[in-house]
Every structure is written in C-alpha cells, then in structure tokens.
C-alpha cells in the first residue's frame, strides 16, 4: 500500500467526482478538508506524506475490579467451610463516566483498512500522470470522523454478583 499525501490546499489534489456523484469539486474539497481538520494526525501533517502506521486508534483504558468476602462456617463435625460473596465490575471507568473506557473503531460498514479517499481516475498521458480522487459517499453521506464509538459489551460496564460455597 502506498503512503497517502495529505493535501494542504485544493490545488494539492486533483478532484474528479465519481460516476453519479452530483457534488461539485469544491463541495468534495470541503468534505475532504473537514475530514482532515477533525483528525489530529492528518491536521498536523497537511502538505506531507503520512508516515506508515502514523494514524492510530485512540488509546482506551479499562479497569476491572473484584471484591470478595469470605464467611467461615463451622459444621457440626468440626469442619470449617467457607461461603464467598463476590462482586465483579468490568470496565469500572465506564461506570463512573459514560465517555471513559469506550473503545473506538473506524466507522462501521467501512473497510478495516480505512480509506477516506478513492481514486476515480488512473494516471495517464491524458491527465499528465496525475490521478484523480474523490471522497466517496456511502448511503448518501461522507464520513465526518475518523473513529466512532465501538458499540459492544467490551465498551460498556458490567457487574456480576457471585456466591460460592467451598467445602473443606
């Protein structure tokens, strides 16, 4: 895969709308510019080639807690059995604040290898060997953010109460 050039101004990129795309070149540029502006890595590397693996997913913290209390019971035969009551909290940070401990991924429905630009015209002598690009629409919309919240059980807090009886 080739490294992507992050355009700084409209003249840095040749915009060619895809077949059936009713947006003007200027409207496509505004979509591209807005996308670049919202992403910290792309924003600070305008006018440069992006480094390999330069853009990374946001870091996520997750803290899991376990509380356990043992209660000892003497049986009539003199044995000491144990009842353990426990409380497990997965993703405790998300319990404290709904924005903490949330995993993020590229927008759903898009390729894991995220591409916000699509080549619409291959380099040739007719276009001075300069490829044409567009920002593709999906279901009538363009992506507006690099990452979105990954809605799954791993991004939400969970609590479990347990009772265990142990024979000795």
Residue ranges and their predicted role:
Residues 1-168:
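Short, solvent-exposed micro-motifs at the edges of structured domains
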């Amino acid at each position: 895969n080739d490294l992507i050039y992050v355009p700084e101004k409209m003249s840095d990129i040749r915009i060619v709308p895809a077949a059936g795309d009713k947006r003007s070149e200027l409207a496509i540029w505004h979509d591209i510019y807005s996308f670049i502006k919202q992403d910290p890595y792309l924003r600070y590397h305008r006018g440069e080639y992006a480094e390999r693996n330069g853009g990374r997913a946001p870091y996520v913290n997750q803290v899991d807690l376990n509380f356990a209390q043992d209660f000892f019971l003497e049986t009539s035969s003199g044995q000491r059995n144990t009842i353990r009551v426990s409380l497990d909290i997965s993703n405790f940070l998300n319990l404290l604040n709904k924005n903490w401990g949330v995993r993020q991924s590229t927008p759903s429905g898009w390729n894991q290898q995220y591409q916000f630009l699509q080549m619409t015209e291959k380099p040739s002598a007719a276009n001075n060997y300069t490829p044409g690009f567009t920002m593709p629409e999906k279901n009538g919309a363009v992506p507006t953010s690099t990452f979105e919240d990954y809605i799954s059980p791993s991004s939400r807090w969970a609590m479990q109460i347990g009772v265990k009886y142990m024979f000795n």
